[in-house]
């Protein structure tokens, strides 16, 4: 259990997620509340259907691999669409960025900068290209 807590603490930004959820529940319109609840239920139901589909395929139900593949793709697409719908509502109430911390951090690109130094008559006397 401690491992799960540590994983959630390290990879979930719950502070940035609970504020928008609370805002939707207290200040959101009925349509936003319904959209958020249905989106969450849709994600959960899609995950359950995905697990049942994989279990049925593992048991050996007489289905073709093509049908199973299409079913898995449809369910995964459902999960993504329901999650996007939920994030859409939360972004209207202050969610900024992804609520998950990515394991690898991207470093900003080191782009060169140009510095202009004016001469006596106002023209560019010296141009220095600075790279970092």
Curated annotation (Swiss-Prot):
Gene Ontology CC terms: extracellular region; host cell membrane; pathogen-containing vacuole membrane
Main location: secreted
Its membrane topology: Multi-pass membrane protein
Pfam families named among the record's database cross-references: IncE
Transmembrane domains' residue ranges: 41-61, 66-86
Keyword set, alphabetical order: Host membrane, Membrane, Secreted, Transmembrane, Transmembrane helix, Virulence
Keyword Membrane: yes
Cell compartments where the protein resides: Secreted; Host vacuole, Host pathogen-containing vacuole, Host pathogen-containing vacuole membrane
Stated role: Inclusion membrane protein probably involved in early modification events of the chlamydial inclusion.
Name the record gives this protein: Inclusion membrane protein E
The organism of origin for this protein: Chlamydia trachomatis serovar D (strain ATCC VR-885 / DSM 19411 / UW-3/Cx)
């Amino acid at each position: 259990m401690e491992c799960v807590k540590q994983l959630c603490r390290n990879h979930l930004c719950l502070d940035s997620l609970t504020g928008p959820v609370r805002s939707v529940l207290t200040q959101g319109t009925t349509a936003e509340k319904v959209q958020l609840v249905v989106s969450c239920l849709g994600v959960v139901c899609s995950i359950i259907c995905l697990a049942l589909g994989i279990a049925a395929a593992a048991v050996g139900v007489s289905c073709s691999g093509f049908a199973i593949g299409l079913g898995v793709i449809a369910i995964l697409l459902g999960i993504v669409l329901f999650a996007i719908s939920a994030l859409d509502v939360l972004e209207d109430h202050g969610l900024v960025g992804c609520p998950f911390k990515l394991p690898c951090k991207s470093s900003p690109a080191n782009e060169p900068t140009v510095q202009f130094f004016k001469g006596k008559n106002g023209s560019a006397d010296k141009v220095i290209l600075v790279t970092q």
